[in-house]
Swiss-Prot record:
Gene that produces this protein: ANXA6
A Pfam family this chain is assigned to: Annexin
UniProt key word Acyltransferase: no
Note: Seems to bind one calcium ion with high affinity.
Residue numbers of Phosphoserine PTMs: 13, 422, 537
Transmembrane spans: none
Family affiliation: Belongs to the annexin family.
UniProt-recorded name of the protein: Annexin A6
Domain remark text: A pair of annexin repeats may form one binding site for calcium and phospholipid.
Cellular component GO terms held in the UniProt record: chromaffin granule membrane; cytoplasm; focal adhesion; melanosome; membrane; mitochondrial crista; nucleus; perinuclear region of cytoplasm
One annotated GO molecular function: enzyme binding
Spans of repeat Annexin: 20-91, 92-163, 175-247, 251-322, 363-434, 435-506, 521-595, 599-670
Residues with the N6-acetyllysine modification: 63, 68, 75, 81, 306, 370, 418, 483, 620
Modified residues (N-acetylalanine): 2
């Protein structure tokens, strides 16, 4: 077990038991398994309150006292997930890793995620111990087994990691940092095709300290985080491995917090992953993982395990977790620093937004108009042709097709499509045919007409559009419905919610950079209105107006600085605090603004995921986002989707829709990740 560095604070959740008596513990375990049935409570209580070193002593004493193998007895007495968890705790860490890897490459198929997790996250010392343990336990060479079971660049990088030769000195050469940034840039972004060997050499061998500086410089030089380049240049398991290496270089604890969250979210629990991480990190960095988990996911690791597991299995995992954490939203001092640094980085990043639908290269509006007319003439409709044409043309090209269709046939293409198509496919195709501002105007009109208002649609559109987009929507709304958007919002909403929407609908957000002094003042207003400031400098209603004005009119770069100052000032995250302190539509619109400022593609990825998860699909939201973002940032949304939900947007759509609607959505989605 790797020990903390000299003077470093111990961050594990399991410690040496103070009055340790291995002989007595061996006897307790023997009695717990004697006779009919076993005392699982006694077993889990004892094993989770001893360190791994102490458990090895218990194993030896058990063999001396009873001539039996303790692990074999535990395997015989226990079953299922509980047995895997307890037996995992009883193995020395290197042997536990060796067993996981053996299982990952045995039988049909390979568990690449397990290989990636272990080899990307372990230190040199842990890798050397793992290689020796594998040889000892299975009388086989680990490198030979892995090379026999994997291929390509993925295999090459695994072999590099298996050497355990990452540099470990903290002295960093600025010249070498610059050279590595240049080499990575030339190997990927500047090259036709990718020089994977450079990525493998630099990411597989340089020290963590050195690589953190390389990543910072790469962002400053290229305007892209290294992760974005890896996603753009690499693919498959090799891409996943390199992203895992980067995450572990940045923060191993954050990498494991993400893995744990993904293991428990959604339907079904990935128990193997959950067990492996809880066992392997319990004496290393479980406290750090817990801090980051709460910061990122607004809930404690403890509460998620509690809600997602049951029985003795749950009790054992909770013991390894080591305790529940305070209310969501508040940062530990260390986590506040991480969040602060994240905002510093995001201020430098120039994320390149990319849509998935681009203008067709060999565009011929005349041929397209004729093909569409043919697809709708006579009996039946050729939906495939309609989808192939409309989903693969830009919006500007579709407007040309509409015009050409009218010139050729004296008919309105929209009216023909409306009469020939139906249901979800009709809504999707007609949406694609409308100019973006008119489409948004229609969605806002639909959200306000009839009984009840679709507040979610109003929020989604008004909280995320740019000034130019909002002004175009206002013009389109007036043109199409002979009424101003502001009047429509006024008559359909009320109170603070109405004021916020009308403010957003003016399209009057500042477009400059940040002002640090003003950002501190704005953060103070936010702290006062959210009732976590020590002092208050005004009455509640004027503070509410100022808070609304800050969120609705300040520029995105400035608001990022405000959120950063808010963390610095309060140790809270503004989004979590709004969720906790506010309610109803006002809370929802403020949260949407904050999320959009933080990461707009991620905001839409979350909305798409929610539109398809659980029973039933929210086709309206799914259609609206796919249509409205297809030429703006749908490629970025796809990347955020797979990063957060561990499955591609393509897979989610495929699993949740069908028929021609599915085909059209996948065409807009633009590919599998």
């Amino acid at each position: 077990m790797a020990k903390p560095a000299q003077g470093a604070k111990y961050r594990g959740s399991i410690r040496d038991f103070p009055d340790f008596n291995p002989s007595q513990d061996a006897e307790t375990l023997y009695n717990a398994m004697k006779g009919f049935g076993s005392d699982k409570e006694a077993i889990l209580e004892l094993i989770t309150s001893r360190s791994n070193r102490q458990r090895q002593e218990i194993c030896q004493n058990y063999k001396s006292l009873y001539g039996k193998d303790l692990i074999a007895d535990l395997k015989y007495e226990l079953t299922g997930k509980f047995e895997r968890l307890i037996v995992g705790l009883m193995r020395p860490p290197a042997y536990a890793d060796a067993k996981e890897i053996k299982d990952a490459i045995s039988g049909i198929g390979t568990d690449e995620k397990c290989l990636i997790e272990i080899l990307a996250s372990r230190t040199n010392e842990q890798i050397h111990q793992l290689v020796a343990a594998y040889k000892d336990a299975y009388e086989r060479d680990l490198e030979a087994d892995i090379t026999g079971d994997t291929s390509g660049h993925f295999r090459k990088m695994l072999v590099v990691l298996l050497q355990g030769t990452r540099e470990e000195d903290d002295v960093v050469s600025e010249d070498l940092v610059q050279q590595d940034v240049q080499d990575l840039y030339e190997a990927g972004e500047l090259k036709w095709g990718t020089d994977e060997a450079q990525f493998i050499y630099i990411l597989g061998n340089r020290s963590k300290q050195h690589l953190r500086l390389v990543f910072d410089e790469y962002l400053k030089t290229t305007g892209k985080p290294i992760e974005a380049s890896i996603r753009g240049e690499l693919s498959g398991d090799f891409e996943k491995l390199m992203l895992a290496v980067v995450k572990c270089i940045r923060s191993t604890a954050e990498y494991f917090a993400e893995r744990l969250f993904k293991a428990m979210k959604g339907l079904g629990t990935r128990d193997n992953t959950l067990i492996r991480i809880m066992v392997s990190r319990s004496e290393l960095d479980m406290l750090d993982i817990r801090e980051i988990f709460r910061t990122k996911y607004e809930k404690s690791l403890y509460s998620m395990i509690k809600n997602d597991t049951s029985g003795e299995y749950k009790k054992t995992l909770l013991k390894l977790c080591g305790g529940d954490d305070d209310a969501a939203g508040q940062f530990f001092p260390e986590a506040a620093q991480v969040a602060y640094q994240m905002w510093e980085l995001s201020a430098v990043a120039r994320v390149e937004l990319k849509g998935t639908v681009r203008p067709a290269g060999d565009f011929n509006p005349d041929a397209d108009a004729k093909a569409l007319r043919k697809a709708m003439k006579g009996l039946g409709t050729d939906e495939d042709t309609i989808i192939d044409i409309i989903a693969h043309r830009s919006n500007a090209q579709r407007q040309q097709i509409r015009q050409t269709f009218k010139s050729h046939f004296g008919r309105d293409l929209m009216a023909d499509l409306k009469s020939e198509l139906s249901g979800d496919l009709a809504r999707l195709i007609l949406g694609l045919m409308m100019p973006p501002a008119h489409y948004d105007a229609k969605q806002l009109k639909k959200a306000m007409e009839g009984a009840g208002t679709d507040e979610k649609a109003l929020i989604e559109i008004l909280a995320t559009r740019t000034n130019a987009e909002i002004q175009a929507i206002n013009k389109a709304y007036k043109e199409d419905y002979h009424k101003s958007l502001e009047d429509a919002l006024s008559s359909d909403t009320s109170g603070h919610f109405k004021r916020i929407l009308i403010s957003l609908a003016t399209g009057n957000r500042e477009e400059g950079g940040e002002d640090r002094e003003r950002a501190r003042e704005d953060a103070q207003v936010a702290a006062e209105i959210l009732e976590i400031a020590d002092t208050t400098s005004g009455d509640k209603s004027s503070l509410e107006t100022r808070f609304m004005m800050i969120l609705c009119t300040r520029s995105y770069p400035h608001l990022r600085r405000v959120f950063q100052e808010f963390i610095k000032m309060t140790n809270y995250d503004v989004e979590h605090t709004i969720k906790k302190e506010m309610s109803g539509d006002v809370r929802d619109v403020f949260v949407a603004i904050v999320q959009s400022v933080k990461n707009k593609p991620l905001f839409f990825a979350d909305k798409l995921y929610k539109s398809m998860k659980g029973a039933g699909t929210d086709e309206k939201t799914l259609t609206r986002i796919m249509v409205s973002r297809s030429e703006i940032d749908l490629l970025n949304i796809r990347r955020e989707f797979i990063e957060k939900y561990d499955k591609s947007l393509h897979q989610a759509i495929e699993g949740d829709t069908s028929g021609h609607f599915l085909k059209a959505l996948l065409a807009i989605c633009g590919g599998e990740d």
